[in-house]
């Protein structure tokens, strides 16, 4: 069971290695998450928006790609949280969560966020899965170009779990055409299978007989994306052949059919 299909999973489904059931409806009472892409010049407006959401009784996530400051110019979670606590969100209960914290500290922070005592949670991708806080309505992802489509889709799924309108804002100053295209895919689509399809186009399915989960397959002629209908027909024919082989006692009977 996967809430976030990855390219290789999608490829396996196309080639018939997996049977699937698709649940493509939102649970009752939930609204579609509004997603936007902005650059860092919008930070001040974002902070004001978060304050309004908190004043309305909601909570927010702010996700950073790093735990601590390094050689890059990316925003580290700990330093960023300190800046926000002493600046834009002074006086608002703010928590920090990342993978380098011990279990008790992480549990204490999450308990505070779940209870509503912590209004803003600055975190790394540790919140990507297994976090369910219906009262959280805002997800801000800093340096969003550093994340893949599957991760972005998972992170966005942390909000939109309650009845209030939820928002996901992808912040990026990247000039990379590939990165910008990836973020626009997130803005355009909310369906995980459509996002996986676009991810498949960008990254490829990987090896069919190896262990690479991305990259172009070593096929000389066939293209799984443009030949999807042909693949489905081939799968149906192969299934029919296997059924005949199992039900016919000899190859001669099979040939006659």
Language model segments and positions:
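Glycine- and acidic-residue-enriched helix-capping/strand-helix junction motifs
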Residues: 70-80
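Inter-lobe coupling/hinge region of RecA-like P-loop helicase motors
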Residues: 30-38, 64-66, 92-105
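Post-DEXD/H (motif II) to motif III coupling segment of the RecA-like Helicase ATP-binding lobe
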Residues: 1-34, 41-51
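Flexible beta-alpha connector loops of hexameric P-loop NTPases
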Residues: 32-41, 71, 144-145
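A short beta-strand-to-loop transition that corresponds to the Sensor-1 phosphate-sensing loop
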Residues: 1-5, 16-17, 65-66, 124-126, ...
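Glycine/Thr-rich phosphate-binding loops of Rossmann-like dinucleotide-binding domains
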Residues: 8-9, 70-71, 131, 149
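C-terminal helicase module of SF1/SF2 nucleic-acid helicases/translocases
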Residues: 43-59, 78, 82-86, 90-248, ...
């Amino acid at each position: 069971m996967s809430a976030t299909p990855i390219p290789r999973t999608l490829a396996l489904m196309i080639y018939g290695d997996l049977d699937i059931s698709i649940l493509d409806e939102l649970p009752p009472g939930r609204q579609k998450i509004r997603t936007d892409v902005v650059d860092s010049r919008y930070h001040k407006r974002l902070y004001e928006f978060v304050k309004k959401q908190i004043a309305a009784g909601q909570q927010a996530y702010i996700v950073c790609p790093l735990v601590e400051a390094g050689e890059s110019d990316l925003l580290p979670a700990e330093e960023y949280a300190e800046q926000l606590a002493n600046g834009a969100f002074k006086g608002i209960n703010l928590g920090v969560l990342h993978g380098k914290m011990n279990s008790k500290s992480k549990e204490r922070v999450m308990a505070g966020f779940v209870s509503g005592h912590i209004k803003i949670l600055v975190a790394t991708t540790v919140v990507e899965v297994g976090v369910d806080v219906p009262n959280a309505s805002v997800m801000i992802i800093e340096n969003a170009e550093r994340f893949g489509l599957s991760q972005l889709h998972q992170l966005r799924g942390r909000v939109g779990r309650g009845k209030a309108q939820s928002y996901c804002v992808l912040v990026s100053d990247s000039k990379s055409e590939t990165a910008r295209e990836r973020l626009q895919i997130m803005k355009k689509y909310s369906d995980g299978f459509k996002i996986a399809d676009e991810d498949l186009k960008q990254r490829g399915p990987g090896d069919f007989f190896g262990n690479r989960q991305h990259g172009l397959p070593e096929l000389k002629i066939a293209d799984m994306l443009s030949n999807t209908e042909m693949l489905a027909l081939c799968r149906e024919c192969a299934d029919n052949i296997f059924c005949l082989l199992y039900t016919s006692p000899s190859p001669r009977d099979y040939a006659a059919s």
